Amino acid sequence: MEINEKLLRQIIEDVLSEMQTSDKPVSFRASTAASAPQAAAAQGDSFLTEIGEAKQGQQQDEVIIAVGPAFGLSQTVNIVGIPHKNILREVIAGIEEEGIKARVIRCFKSSDVAFVAVEGNRLSGSGISIGIQSKGTTVIHQQGLPPLSNLELFPQAPLLTLETYRQIGKNAARYAKRESPQPVPTLNDQMARPKYQAKSAILHIKETKYVVTGKNPQELRVAL
């Protein structure tokens, strides 16, 4: 598919204009990364509170929702502006509708949704986790699978609706009950990738600023 260079340039300029905030310049130095979550906490939405290091789950009737390091902190909406609070509300509701408990943790070692999800499934009592990047990309993962394998992947974040997030929660809960649900239906738009590619890259870079090498996941109290 040929992409008009002028259109692409305009998209990138629009994205950069949108993304101009009071953030400091991107730096991947360890000293900056280590202090970033604390600095961002003052800016973040108060609906998520860290309450200590996440522990290994003992209950098989739970699904862990593992969010990226900037989720609810420096970033509070996904790539198309859906608030993180609303996304979590729907995912949790979907899980609970299936009679399963939801537990939310924040992961710091990676901004890659696959590795965030793997940290979650290792702590999940059922072995099932949902990984969510700040930009909205989501995956359902199972303990024992390699990071780049998964039960269901939702890579086109711009096309994920709140109803889709709710269905993701329901399916994750069904996997926790050892059922074999039909995959969550999703929209497909070939233009979504070129339209949002620049913004997606910028959001990923911004989230990567909050990676803290070696920091263990933190349990989150969620106020919805």
Swiss-Prot record:
The keyword tRNA-binding does not apply. Ethanogenic BMCs can be made in E.coli by targeting pyruvate decarboxylase (pdc) and alcohol dehydrogenase (adh) to them. PduP(1-18)-Pdc and PduD(1-18)-Adh strains targeted to the BMC (PduA, PduB, PduJ, PduK, PduN, PduU) make significantly more ethanol than strains where Pdc and Adh are not targeted to the BMC. Its main location: other. Keywords: Bacterial microcompartment, Cobalamin, Cobalt, Lyase. SUPFAM superfamilies: B12-dependent dehydatase associated subunit. Residues 1-18 are annotated as: Targets protein to the BMC. Its cofactor is adenosylcob(III)alamin. Pathway: Polyol metabolism; 1,2-propanediol degradation. It is found in: Bacterial microcompartment. One of its GO terms (biological process) is propanediol catabolic process. GO terms for molecular function: cobalamin binding; lyase activity. One of its GO terms (cellular component) is bacterial microcompartment. InterPro entries: B12-dep_deHydtase_bsu (IPR010254), Dehydtase/Dehydtase_re (IPR003208), Ppandiol/glycerol_DHydtase_msu (IPR025541). The keyword Lyase applies. Belongs to the diol/glycerol dehydratase medium subunit family. Part of the PduCDE complex that catalyzes the dehydration of 1,2-propanediol (1,2-PD) to propionaldehyde. This subunit is directly targeted to the bacterial microcompartment (BMC). The N-terminal 18 residues form an alpha-helix which targets this enzyme and foreign proteins (tested with alcohol dehydrogenase) to the BMC. This is Propanediol dehydratase medium subunit. It comes from Citrobacter freundii.
